[in-house]
């Protein structure tokens, strides 16, 4: 249930490893698009996966979930729990799905939490299902199977995970989920995203926990990743004051096997729908339970300051922003996605336009979503059009194609050869050799 990013990746991948999957969503227009073979979001390999599994009948879509719910062996809830303005969790969509299940089914069912949910959600679901279901019609088991899918690599993350986490309170649920995930756990399936068989991969570790522990593991994991990113950004600020190079520092620190290099990249901060929300939810959980939330709160504070720091760096470089033409390369919160939710690039776009700058933008995938949110956005067909006669060019998303642009050409078409690299994508030595004034994050100018 739910045809967003998590639901489509989970449904498409489960269908690809041999299961019959029905994806249900109350958004009839979204279902219509999916039935026509049109994906409403960008995720590498997902479109071909959906088309292939839809064509062979292993994956279908419906806006009327009742029949699918009755015939299902397991019901995966791929429905997020957003936050209200006051920081409280909004369970409306999840509760609505639970009520729909309770009214539709007439036999015992396994309900699986797939999207990230607050701790104790499983118990709330059980209670809601019990009080909503007509007496003696059905018995429900609730399990947690948190997803660890990164936007941009989600399909590969599903097929080749480091671990599969199952939160369980009964043996029957464990048996069902072991059977569902057997091809993944054994790495015994034809990989649909490679022309030939997949290269050998290490078998994923199966982790069994209680439902409550599994819910906590997911929140704690995301909060820790946020702390690592913010720690790298604190190091970047320190390097700028001391004349050090944050990439040299984080590379050396990350070689320690106790730390590892992932998520130690300095820049303009993290965004997206999940990490900021999960960090706030984790802080709120700690406070509610009387536990010191200083560390995750500090990570949130550091992250919220990143775009202001980069905005000030841009302002110092240009002196006056009003009427200056500024080109933005990248609008999505990270590469390989069209997701602009909580994107640092979007925050900078709003700050720059509010200051009177004339902003042009290019993103390989996120322009449509950006236009929907900001109809006045001046978008360009490529990076060169965006850079033409620009007083400054800001790199805000780490798209690989930005690394290999014809930078001498861009040098020739800009009004002023000023580049501010918010993702440390380019070599300072190379850019300066071309005659650019080049500033990045935590590296010597």
Regions found by a protein language model. Give the residues of each.
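Structural/interface elements that position substrates and couple domains in central-metabolism enzymes
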Residues: 1-445
């Amino acid at each position: 249930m739910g045809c967003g990013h998590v639901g489509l990746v989970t449904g498409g991948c489960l269908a690809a490893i041999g299961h019959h999957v029905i994806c249900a969503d109350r958004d009839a227009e979204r279902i219509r698009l999916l039935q026509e073979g049109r994906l409403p979001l960008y995720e590498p390999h997902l479109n071909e996966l959906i088309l292939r599994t839809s064509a062979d009948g292993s994956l279908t879509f419906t806006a009327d979930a009742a029949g699918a719910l009755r015939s299902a062996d397991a019901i995966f809830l791929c429905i997020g729990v957003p936050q209200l303005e006051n920081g409280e969790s909004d369970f409306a969509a999840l509760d609505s799905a639970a009520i729909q299940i309770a009214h539709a089914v007439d036999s015992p069912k396994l309900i699986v939490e797939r999207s990230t949910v607050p701790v104790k959600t499983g118990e709330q679901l059980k209670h809601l299902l019990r009080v909503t279901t007509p007496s003696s019609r059905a018995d429900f088991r609730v399990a947690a199977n948190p997803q660890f899918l990164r936007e941009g690599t989600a399909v590969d993350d599903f097929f080749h995970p480091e671990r599969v986490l199952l939160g369980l309170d009964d043996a029957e649920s464990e048996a069902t989920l072991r059977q569902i995930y057997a091809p993944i756990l054994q790495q015994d399936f034809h990989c649909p995203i490679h022309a030939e068989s997949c290269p050998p991969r290490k078998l994923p570790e199966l982790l069994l926990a209680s439902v409550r522990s599994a819910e906590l593991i997911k929140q704690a994991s995301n909060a820790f990743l946020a702390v690592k990113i913010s720690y790298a950004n604190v190091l970047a600020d320190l390097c700028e004051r001391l004349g050090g190079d944050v990439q040299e520092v984080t590379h050396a620190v990350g070689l320690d096997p106790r730390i590892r290099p992932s998520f130690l990249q300095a820049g303009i901060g993290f965004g997206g729908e999940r990490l900021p929300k999960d960090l706030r939810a984790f802080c709120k959980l700690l406070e509610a339970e009387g536990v010191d939330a200083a560390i995750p709160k500090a990570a949130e504070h550091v992250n919220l300051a990143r775009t202001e720091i980069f905005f000030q760096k841009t302002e110092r470089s240009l002196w006056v922003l009003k009427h200056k033409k500024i080109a933005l390369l990248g609008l999505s919160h990270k590469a390989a996605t069209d997701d602009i939710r909580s994107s640092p690039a979007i925050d900078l776009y709003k700050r720059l336009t509010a200051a009177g700058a004339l902003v042009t933008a290019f993103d390989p995938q996120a322009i449509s979503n950006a236009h929907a949110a900001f109809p006045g956005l001046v978008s360009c067909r490529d990076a060169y059009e965006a850079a033409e006669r620009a007083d400054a060019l800001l790199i805000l998303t780490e798209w690989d194609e930005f690394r290999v642009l014809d930078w001498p050409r861009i040098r020739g078409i800009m009004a002023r050869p000023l580049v501010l690299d918010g993702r440390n994508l380019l070599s300072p030595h190379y850019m300066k050799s071309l005659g650019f004034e080049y500033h990045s994050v935590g590296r010597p100018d």
